[in-house]
From Swiss-Prot:
Homodimer. The keyword Hydrolase applies. One of its GO terms (cellular component) is cytoplasm. This is Putative D-tyrosyl-tRNA(Tyr) deacylase 2. Its EC number is 3.1.-.-. Belongs to the DTD family. Highly divergent. The keyword Transcription regulation does not apply. May hydrolyze D-tyrosyl-tRNA(Tyr) into D-tyrosine and free tRNA(Tyr). Could be a defense mechanism against a harmful effect of D-tyrosine. InterPro entries: Daa-tRNA_deacyls_DTD, DTD-like_sf. Keywords: Cytoplasm, Hydrolase. It is found in: Cytoplasm.
Length: 181
């Protein structure tokens, strides 16, 4: 699921470490499986990244200029991407409760999530030696300041799989798209 954002703050250590992203998109992701399906491969993950980056649905990325034709994230390389693992997307209502039987096993989901984030960073040209596992700059001087508005800067920031996803974000409106890839 994609959600447009003006800026976002995501908790990555269950306590007090937040990473920040500027104007761009949040990607909520869950990995589902049914008993008859084959395991999710790197090829399938790369395909999902391609759909994410090449689908022309965004018309609002640049407040400085109006655009008439939808653009893809590929056409807006300066926009930030905030990836949030979101197992609740895999919930199905049964009776009066929600069940999550379609989610892949937690260890499989963690590995798929790490690979997906890696493929997004590679596709966006992020130098992974300069960022930590969440995509935050290793150098404090490169990190956005904790106060004020965050300028977009081609960041690919990701939450920590299995942790509580404390999320704060601002958006110009409910611009949300759901993809089943």
């Amino acid at each position: 699921m994609l959600q447009a954002m003006d800026q976002g703050h995501l908790l990555v250590n269950n306590v007090d470490k937040y990473v920040r992203a500027g104007r761009g998109v949040m990607v909520y992701i869950a990995f589902l499986s049914d008993r008859d399906s084959a395991p999710i491969t790197d090829e399938a993950l790369r395909h999902a990244v391609g759909v994410l980056l090449h689908t022309k649905i965004f018309t609002h990325f640049s407040p400085e200029k109006m655009i008439n034709q939808p653009q893809s994230l590929e056409e807006c390389p300066e926009m930030d991407i905030l990836i949030v693992p979101q197992a609740s997307l895999g919930g199905k209502v049964k009776g009066r409760s929600v069940q999550f039987h379609q989610l892949v096993a937690k260890d499989v989901g963690a590995a798929l999530y790490d690979r997906f984030c890696h493929f997004v960073r590679v596709a966006r040209g992020v130098d992974e030696s300069r960022v930590d596992a969440n995509g935050a700059p290793r150098s404090e001087g490169d990190a956005p300041k904790a106060e004020g508005w965050i300028k977009y800067n081609s960041r690919v920031i990701s939450g920590t799989f299995g942790n509580r996803q404390g999320l704060r974000f601002e958006s110009e409106g409910p611009f949300t798209h759901m993809f089943d890839i």
